[in-house]
Amino acid sequence: MALTKAEMAEHLFETLGINKRVAKEMVESFFEEIRGALESGEQVKLSGFGNFDLRDKNQRPGRNPKTGEDIPISARRVVTFRPGQKLKTRVEASNAGK
């Protein structure tokens, strides 16, 4: 099961008592800020959670799995996420009891 933006908005509604429309807008705004920063080439650091980084990948050789034909995989920029130590610790602790 995955946590969705709708569930995040519902949690804000229940916890903070704000109306559902405002809660949904807050969640959307949060993610739009992250998207905008990454589109501008900025790193996103969320203290206690982790970092979103941009990484440039060079062109490399690849292969079409159906035909076996060699094809180039074009250069691109990708987003990576590195969890912070607090997040790692909490995930490991919650997984230890299972």
Curated annotation (Swiss-Prot):
> Does the record carry tRNA-binding as a key word?
no
A GO BP annotation: regulation of DNA-templated transcription
Gene Ontology molecular function, alphabetical? DNA binding; structural constituent of chromatin
Pfam families, per the entry? Bac_DNA_binding
Recorded hits in InterPro entries, A to Z, give:
Hist_DNA-bd (IPR000119), Histone-like_DNA-bd_CS (IPR020816), IHF-like_DNA-bd_dom_sf (IPR010992), IHF_alpha (IPR005684)
**Keywords of this protein's UniProt record, alphabetized?**
DNA recombination, DNA-binding, Transcription, Transcription regulation, Translation regulation
Q: Where is this region: Disordered?
A: 49-71
Task: Provide the Gene Ontology terms for cellular component.
Answer: cytosol
* Keyword field contains DNA-binding: yes
- Which pairs are disulfide-linked? none
- Function per UniProt: This protein is one of the two subunits of integration host factor, a specific DNA-binding protein that functions in genetic recombination as well as in transcriptional and translational control.
Q: Which HAMAP family match?
A: IHF_alpha (MF_00380)
Q: Tell me the subunit arrangement.
A: Heterodimer of an alpha and a beta chain.
Q: Which family does it belong to?
A: Belongs to the bacterial histone-like protein family.
Record-linked NCBIfam families:
himA, PRK00285.1
**The protein's name:** Integration host factor subunit alpha
Originating species: Shewanella sp. (strain MR-4)
Identify the taxonomic lineage of the organism of origin.
Answer: Bacteria, Pseudomonadati, Pseudomonadota, Gammaproteobacteria, Alteromonadales
